[in-house]
């Protein structure tokens, strides 16, 4: 017996019984993004490894532990399956000069890859939708992005299950001053740090505060706060952002320990969090990355964006029973006898041209078997064609979901008959 193959651990198939749920969510996202003036960009799944090391940060979990990296056997280049979408999008912006006399607002959707321990809401292949708004330095675009995500939750019916947490990371100089104070603080508490904390203490001290280790929580809570090191300009930006969010009627929680796991963030950062999914509670996160475009070879320009975990949002929608029932076809065509198959095929094309979704039985099967399939398909109507109907130029119309007598009508009256029955 031939070997059976299985999907790679942590990388899941989306079967037809679930794919309609993805389509529903994707359609809602596309409508939202169009309403806010965002344009789609599609970048390769594979990028050169140095792009991610430069943008995400060398001393981050993603770069150190989670990237799927391999060597191109043809030229020896180090390549990586994208672990997030911002770096590749900005690489494309710089490469194709999209910032020339423009402030692009871009969105992407697709699979990302991280070598993590698979669990509910955390996978090795996962899907993100993300946005990047470029060339806009004020807090107004930061507020609009929050408004857009809040709008999505409202449209999906999950506003009551999510909360917004925000913080400001300041600029490079302010973070440097805070970093110096934080390292000094951590050095005084080095005896209680775990091995990961000791390793990061001098390379990425902010991430030490983002610990999930309960034994370190008290130490982290008492650490110097970045908010105490914000200068006038960063503080004004943060206060302006908060004022706009409040004016839009969006509730938020200030979280001084919200630092995000990617090194490119500065000033505004945020997370949308839910308590309904256990440990994997963050469903959308992002922030400002002024300076990153310049680091990737472009001109100096501001930027802000977010990434949304699509699987996690779908899990929340499923948990709350907010996904629609699977869409069924409008018409199932049953055919019996010589010539009925071709007759039905022509009729099916006419129906599809008029906007109906149609499944035609193909191959040999009894009338009883075909009617059973018609009922199981979820179709609203069965159209029945046999040799007698072909000779008379007629079709039998049977309603499958309503107590209506079946009727035999002329073939050219089928569309009008269906329209009447659906009214």
From Swiss-Prot:
The keyword Cell inner membrane does not apply. One of its GO terms (cellular component) is cytoplasm. Keywords: Aminoacyl-tRNA synthetase, ATP-binding, Cytoplasm, Ligase, Nucleotide-binding, Protein biosynthesis. GO terms for biological process: histidyl-tRNA aminoacylation. It is found in: Cytoplasm. InterPro entries: aa-tRNA-synth_II (IPR006195), aa-tRNA-synth_II/BPL/LPL (IPR045864), Anticodon-bd (IPR004154), Anticodon-bd_dom_sf (IPR036621), His-tRNA-ligase (IPR015807), HisRS-like_core (IPR041715), HisRS/HisZ (IPR004516), HisRS_anticodon (IPR033656). It is an enzyme of class 6 (ligase). Its EC number is 6.1.1.21. Belongs to the class-II aminoacyl-tRNA synthetase family. Homodimer. This is Histidine--tRNA ligase. It comes from Chromobacterium violaceum (strain ATCC 12472 / DSM 30191 / JCM 1249 / CCUG 213 / NBRC 12614 / NCIMB 9131 / NCTC 9757 / MK).
């Amino acid at each position: 017996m031939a070997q059976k193959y299985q999907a790679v651990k942590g990388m899941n198939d989306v079967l037809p019984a679930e794919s309609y749920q993805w389509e529903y969510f994707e359609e809602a996202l596309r409508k939202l993004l169009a309403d806010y003036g965002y344009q789609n960009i599609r970048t390769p799944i594979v990028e050169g490894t140095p792009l991610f090391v430069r943008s995400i940060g060398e001393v981050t979990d993603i770069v150190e532990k989670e990237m799927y990296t391999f060597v191109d056997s043809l030229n020896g280049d180090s390549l990586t399956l994208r672990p997030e979408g911002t770096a590749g999008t900005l690489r494309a912006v710089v490469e194709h000069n999209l910032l020339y006399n423009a402030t692009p607002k871009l969105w992407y959707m697709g699979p990302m890859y991280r070598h993590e321990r698979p669990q509910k809401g955390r996978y090795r292949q996962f899907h993100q939708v993300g946005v990047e708004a470029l060339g806009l330095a004020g807090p107004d675009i930061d507020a609009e992005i929050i408004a857009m995500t809040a709008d999505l939750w409202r449209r999906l019916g999950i506003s009551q299950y999510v909360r917004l947490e925000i913080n400001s990371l300041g600029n490079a100089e302010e973070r440097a001053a805070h970093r110096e104070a934080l390292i000094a603080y951590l050095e005084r508490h080095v005896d209680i740090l775990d091995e990961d904390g000791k390793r990061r203490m001098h390379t990425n001290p902010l991430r030490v505060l983002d610990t999930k280790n309960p034994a370190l929580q008290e130490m982290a809570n008492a650490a110097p706060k970045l908010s105490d090191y914000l200068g006038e300009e960063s503080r004004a930006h943060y206060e302006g952002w908060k004022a706009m969010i409040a004016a839009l009627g969006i509730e938020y929680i200030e979280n001084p320990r919200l630092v995000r796991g990617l090194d490119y963030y500065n000033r505004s950062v945020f997370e949308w969090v839910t308590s309904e999914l256990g440990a994997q509670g963050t469903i959308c996160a992002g922030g400002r990355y002024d300076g990153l475009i310049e680091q990737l070879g472009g001109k100096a320009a501001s930027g802000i964006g977010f990434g949304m975990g699509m699987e996690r949002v779908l899990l929340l929608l499923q948990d709350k029973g907010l996904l629609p029932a699977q869409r069924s076809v409008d018409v199932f065509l049953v055919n019996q006898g010589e010539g009925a198959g071709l007759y039905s095929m022509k009729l099916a094309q006419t129906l599809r041209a008029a906007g109906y979704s149609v499944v035609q039985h193909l191959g040999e099967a009894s009338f009883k078997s075909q009617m059973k399939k018609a009922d199981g398909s979820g179709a609203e109507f069965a159209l029945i064609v046999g040799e007698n109907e072909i000779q008379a130029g007629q079709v039998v119309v049977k309603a499958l979901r309503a107590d209506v007598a079946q009727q035999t009508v002329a073939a050219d009256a089928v569309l009008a008959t269906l329209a009447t029955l659906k009214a």
